[in-house]
Structure formats: C-alpha cells, structure tokens
C-alpha cells in the first residue's frame, strides 16, 4: 500500500492581480487532472491572516509533475509579488487514527482509511 502525500502551501496573502488568478487557475486545473491527485483543501487561520492550501496525492510522481509544470515554475518566480510570506510542507501520511466517524473527504478515497478502519490504532507522523 502506498501512503498519501500532503503538499501544504501555507502563506500570508499579499496583493493578487489578473496574472496571479490566471496562473492559479491553471495550476489547480493541472493538479486536479493528475492521475495521483486525491483532493485539495483550503484553510484560513481564525484571524484571517494566513491561508493553507493542502493538496493530497497518491504518489510522489504526481507531486514531481506538479513541481515541474511550467505555469507553476512561473508562479514560483513571482512569489514575492503576490505573498507577504510562505512556507511549503511536503509530508508523507503514513498513519492516521480516529473513531471512524469523521467524514473527511480525502480519507474517504484513501487506501490509508481502509487500512486503518479495521480497528488498529496508530500514530500520526
């Protein structure tokens, strides 16, 4: 069984322009079309200052394809133009646990959920 890869882009937004929105849409469309794409979730801090876009993938091959996508490379060159600050976190979800009642979308599609719902408890890495 392969593990789930979570790619988080945590950022403090700056000023967006037309080029940002165009590239952002193209990147989202490309990412969601990758064979290993599971889902994307977006979170905002309680004070609204920070945002977190979390992309879930089935494999590193998909993560690497996104990293090499030409529009993504252009956006990376302009990061200071659109963001006050940012951090990238790429993590491998090797385990998860809970009572089985939380209907979190990426877990519904994940082989990790099926593995862990058989009653074994594990820890989050």
Please report, for each region that a protein language model flagged, where it lies by residue.
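Short S/T/G/P-rich N-terminal loop/turn motif that feeds into the first structured element of a domain
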Residues: 1-51, 62-65, 84-125
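An amphipathic, aromatic/His-enriched active-site/gating alpha helix that lines ligand/cofactor pockets
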Residues: 56, 60-89
């Amino acid at each position: 069984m392969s593990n789930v890869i979570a790619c988080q882009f945590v950022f403090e937004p700056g000023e967006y322009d037309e080029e940002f929105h165009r590239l952002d849409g193209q990147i989202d469309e490309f990412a969601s079309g990758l064979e290993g794409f599971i889902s994307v979730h977006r979170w905002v801090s309680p004070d609204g200052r920070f945002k977190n876009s979390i992309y879930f993938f089935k494999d590193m091959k998909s993560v690497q394809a996104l990293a090499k996508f030409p529009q993504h490379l252009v956006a990376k060159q302009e990061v200071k133009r659109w963001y006050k600050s940012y951090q990238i976190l790429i993590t491998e979800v090797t385990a998860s646990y809970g009572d089985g009642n939380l209907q979190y979308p990426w877990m519904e599609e994940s082989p990790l959920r099926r593995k862990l719902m058989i009653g074994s408890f594990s820890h989050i890495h």
